[in-house]
Amino acid sequence: MEFVRHHDKPFAGGVEKAKEIGYEYIEPMVHLGRELLSEAGYFHSVSMYEDPLYIREICDKHGIKVSGLSTHTPLCKPEISVEYLKMAIRFASDLGAPVVNTDEGPKPAWTTKEMDYTLMKYTLTEAAMVAERHGILIGLEQHQQYSKSPEGLQSIYELVESPAIGINFDAGNAYLGGGGDVYDWLESVKHKLVHFHAKDISIQQGKDERGKVTGTPVGCACGDGVVDWKRVIEIIKTSEKEVVLSVECGTVPDAVKSFEYLSKLL
């Protein structure tokens, strides 16, 4: 639902706009506690203090389904992530969202890589136990220092052996991280996919940032950037898995353009 982030829309307004454009699914962002912009109706994030059944009512009213929840939290910081993810998994279960998406997050300034992997294993183990009980999947996304390469993302995926853990592949982050060929990477993880972020990267952003950053919050309209979406969709189809393409762009016009472009390829 990042497409309404610059339009001062509340969650319900974002759901209504998604339906108006033609989208079948949304991926809500959730947070702990209360914060001013969401409570005032100027931001789309949902507090997990809300009743998840009420959130589902809003979606049902507009005929919208939930593909997953955006629950990005630093796995390297268990004091933040363990309880947040466990609560998000329970919230997703009641809401009817099959997936919660996350990443390793910015690491603590003082830890070593070895320590970070121990911390991530602890966090993911705690989260996976709850996810297995509730039948929820955890989508690991390439977004930060360790997951920016195919080998790095795989190393995090292998930390915990659980049927609840899969991959939320982000095409834009895979490109910007510069850790390898996007399509070879997608091919290598296609059978682990539980969700997919349809994020395109403008040619200019690619020139300016590729290999210098590990990801970006949102991209340009799908079809306007560097990603070969026809090739991406062909790879996903060979996975024989039902995977939702969750568009990540920053404006309503880009969301409209992305929907129209991708719909022709599906």
Model region roles, listed by residue range:
Residues 244-256:
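A short, acidic, flexible beta-alpha connecting loop/helix-capping segment that sits on the rim
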Residues 1-99, 115, 121, 125, ...:
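N-terminal pre-domain/capping segments
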Residues 92-113, 134-147, 246-247:
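Active-site groove signature of glycoside hydrolases
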Residues 1, 26-28, 66-71, 100-102, ...:
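Hydrophobic faces of well-ordered beta-strands that scaffold small-molecule active sites
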Residues 61-62, 95, 133-134, 163, ...:
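Helix C-cap/helix->beta junction micro-motif
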Residues 221, 230-233, 237-239, 243-245:
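H/E-rich (His + Asp/Glu) clusters that bind or coordinate divalent metals
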Residues 8-9, 15, 25-26, 125-226, ...:
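Acidic/histidine-rich catalytic cores of soluble enzymes
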